[in-house]
A protein has these predicted regions:
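Alpha-helical bundle segments that constitute or directly flank the non-heme di-iron/ferroxidase center
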Residues: 14-32
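Structured surface interface patches that mediate subunit assembly and partner/cofactor docking
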Residues: 1-9, 29-61, 65-173
Length: 173
């Protein structure tokens, strides 16, 4: 299934797995006070994705183990806030891409309501309207001209749709 397409049109399953490990590495970099945009995504061998994920997750836990990091001000093109706010925005990305992988591989996870609620709350840092232009403006102001816009335009979904559906719709799925 590694070559199967995902709803994130520029990535197949293999590329998505590499991206998710890279996201964890960026989260760890932020926790250490390093530049998350200096992190490069390095694909793992096809039979080592689980090991790569576990190693990167341990780096995240180590980098964020001091609660003071949660209070530190941090800035990314899509959010300026505390470390906790930035973590929530990455939780949103990880949740959406987990949905992408589940969809691509025919799985239907039992979504954790608390996790999805936190991921949904994180989307409030950027408006659904005109956010691409805002993202590009902020990226340029931060000197990050090479950072790709991490979401597509929001798609309509009923207000009473399941939380995971509202989250992925906000991200253009």
């Amino acid at each position: 299934q590694l070559t199967a397409p995902t709803p994130c049109s520029e990535m197949d399953v293999r590329a998505m797995l590499g991206h998710l490990v890279g996201v964890l590495d960026r989260i760890a970099a932020l926790g250490r006070g390093d530049d998350p945009f200096a992190v490069t995504e390095t694909p793992a061998p096809d039979d080592r994705w689980s090991d790569a994920w576990t190693t990167s997750a341990r780096r995240v836990a180590e980098a964020w183990r001091d609660d003071a990091v949660l209070e530190q001000p941090m800035a990314l093109p899509w959010i300026h806030g505390s470390g906790a706010d930035v973590l929530a925005s990455y939780l949103s990305e990880l949740t959406v891409h987990t949905w992408d992988l589940a969809t691509a591989t025919g799985q239907q996870p039992d979504w954790d309501d608390t996790v999805v609620a936190e991921a949904l709350a994180a989307r409030d840092f950027l408006p659904a309207e005109n956010r691409r232009a805002l993202f590009e403006e902020i990226s340029t102001a931060m000197g990050l001209d090479e950072v790709a816009v991490p979401f597509a335009e929001a798609t309509p979904v009923p207000d009473d749709a399941p939380a995971i559906d509202r989250l992925v719709a906000w991200n253009g799925r």
